[in-house]
Amino acid sequence: LTTGENTPVAVGDVLNASLAAGTAATLYSSATGTSGVSCTSSAFTATVTANPAAPGTASESLTGHTFDTGGCTSNVVGVLGVSGITVDNLPYTTAVSSDGTITVTPAAGSAVQTTVRLRTLLGTITCVYQAPALTGTASNADNSIAFTKQHFTRSSGTSLCFSDGYFTAKYAPVTDTSLPGGPVVHVG
């Protein structure tokens, strides 16, 4: 991970990114469908824990991953709206390879978990989704991190909670907020 003219990002620096302009984070009920939840405001925060020279693999501690539910909608039949989305079991470990491959893993014995609260005519329901890990891609073209159709399974919730969730989101630009001006971060 570097900033500017190949300056290595320091261990302990805090990285941040929001959704790429004009995009949405989605959790759809199938890999090919468009039924589910969509949010236009989301962000993540991570702290760099290791940053060896390329071709090494950098490590980060993902300490925050938020969704502004004011920008979230759902088109699931029977659902009136989204009252909350929480990413649980933080922090996660994020490994960033010099080729741009990203792997997000939870603590041992845990899971990547998201709790979605949906408003229905019968009240608010809680849907919990889990995945063993997530895989994404970092790109220097726009200093982005993207996740595409990452598969979650429902671990609890009523029948209104779809049984599978496929998460897609693109965050850009990733910046180093520990440095003046928050320069963008490059991989490799």
Describe the predicted segments one by one.
Residues L15, D88, S98, A141-D142, ...:
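Intrinsic-disorder/low-complexity regions
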Residues V87, L122-T124, F147, F162, ...:
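Alpha-helical structural elements
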